[in-house]
Amino acid sequence: MNINGAVALVTGGASGLGLATSEQLLEAGAAVVILDLPGSAGAAVADKLGDRARFSAGDVTSESDVTAALDVAAELGPLRVAVNCAGTGNAIKTVGRDGPFPLDQFTRIVNINLVGTFNVIRLAAHRMAATDPVDGERGVIVNTASVAAFDGQIGQAAYSASKGGIVGMTLPIARDLAAAQIRVVTIAPGLFDTPLLGTLPDEARASLGRQVPHPARLGDPAEYAALVAHIVANPMLNGEVIRLDGAIRMAPR
């Protein structure tokens, strides 16, 4: 899929991995719609990114919000790329000092990370399937899982379950959408220098980076975005989960 001239939807595009992805796709010639929460910096980010960027406020778990973002994308042209970067996490033990893991907190993480991702996939794929193919492809969908899907740490039951679900649905969805000439690939990032880690002291962030075998540092969001661009451009990448983690395997805590 040629990025130049394509229209892309990026969820969570106002910060972190999503922002880097939006910047990368725009630099490669795409038009980008950022879908992020109303309280995010999405409007300011889109304004800064220029004429080919748009912001649509919404929640990935809402069918109407995602549909509205896709309608904004349709104003720019046929949707060709969707990148799921929206997500959240928590750190709660299955049984802690205050009792069992609150079920509403578990379902909240799964709903945003897993159900929200699938909601965007199904609605974006429906739009893509109605477009004319270009060089044998109608679209590319890239999802964001995590190494926590494989190496979940203490307190990550909900987060690991949500990201493991994204890993598990990648291949069947790719098979579902193959007849429509739509590819689906998932990236499982390791430790990246995102706003979430940016709240930690410098020494704590440096210590986390030293846990990565090579390169012994936190990942740069631009490196995630570069992989997204390669996935979009490489027609043989489909149904795969790619760990982007510097060979780290997380310890229990």
Where are these regions (language model features)?
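Catalytic Tyr-X3-Lys loop
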Residues: 88, 99-119, 142, 159, ...
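Active-site helix of classical SDR
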Residues: 121, 162, 170
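Conserved mid-core segment of classical short-chain dehydrogenase/reductases
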Residues: 89-107, 126, 130-135, 155-158, ...
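Alpha-helical segment proximal to the catalytic Tyr-Lys
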Residues: 126, 174-176
